[in-house]
Curated annotation (Swiss-Prot):
Localisation: Cytoplasm
The gene coding this protein: cmk
GO molecular function: ATP binding; CMP kinase activity; dCMP kinase activity
Main location: cytoplasm
Binding site for ATP: G17, P18, T19, A20, S21, G22, K23, G24, T25
This protein's name: Cytidylate kinase
Length: 223
């Protein structure tokens, strides 16, 4: 059931979940149905990772990576995302960037640097935000919080299909191993570990189509 956001604030629906749970696709579909904006928070972490990789920074250099996040030069233009003036939409979906992003997402300095940048996306008429801690940390007063789950094998198959469709080589066994490692990092990190907010609706999409999952979210919103 939807709840009221803070007085004067635009309504927010948060969709959190592990890697390749479908949250990005669902967030975009729900936002389109409602005529709202969408925030892909994972893109900000991937952009930070890409910027750090371009500078040759190891993922273990927390202060340097946090400084990159603080000064991140990004621009979103519809489906396109630009890093330092260059279209980075393809690069940020590479597995190397995703694994780096998962590591640096545990750093308090990186998370704090990106926090207000994420909150700035909250504008009328409303926002659908997807990520890992949107409901628990970034938008704790969200009108509706969804935590999307799916079994890891299904998620690995989805990611493999997505990468191949984008012309990126992918190996299912490697993806499955990386995904299990990423899940462990995300759930065990000290800062904002991956977990549903106390008032979130947990939605298992393992046996659902995209359309069925979108409708389930909209049903929660309209309830």
């Amino acid at each position: 059931m939807a709840i009221f956001a803070s007085a004067g604030a635009a309504p927010v629906i948060t969709i959190d979940g592990p890697t390749a749970s479908g949250k990005g696709t669902i967030a975009h579909r729900v936002a389109k149905q409602l005529g709202w904006d969408v925030l892909d928070s994972g893109a900000l972490y991937r952009l930070t990772a890409l910027a750090a990789l371009r500078r040759g920074l190891p993922a273990t250099d927390e202060p340097a990576v946090a400084a990159v996040a603080q000064a991140l030069d990004v621009r979103f233009d519809g489906p396109h995302v630009y890093l330092e003036g260059r279209d980075a939409g393809h690069e940020i979906r590479q597995e190397e960037v995703g694994n780096y992003a998962s590591r640096i997402a545990a750093y308090p300095g990186v998370r704090q640097a990106l926090l207000e940048r994420q909150r700035a996306f909250r504008q009328p008429p409303g926002l659908v935000a997807d990520g890992r801690d949107m409901g628990a940390v970034v938008f704790p007063d969200a009108s509706l919080k969804i935590f999307l789950v799916a079994d890891v094998e299904a998620r690995a198959q989805r990611r493999c299909k997505q990468l191949i469709e984008k012309g990126i080589s992918a190996n299912l066994d490697d993806l499955l191993r990386d995904m299990r490692e990423r899940d462990a990092r995300d759930t065990q990190r000290a800062v904002a570990p991956l977990a549903p907010a106390a008032d979130a609706h947990v939605l298992d999409s393992s046996g659902l189509t995209i359309e069925q999952t979108v409708q389930a979210v909209l049903d929660f919103w309209c309830a």
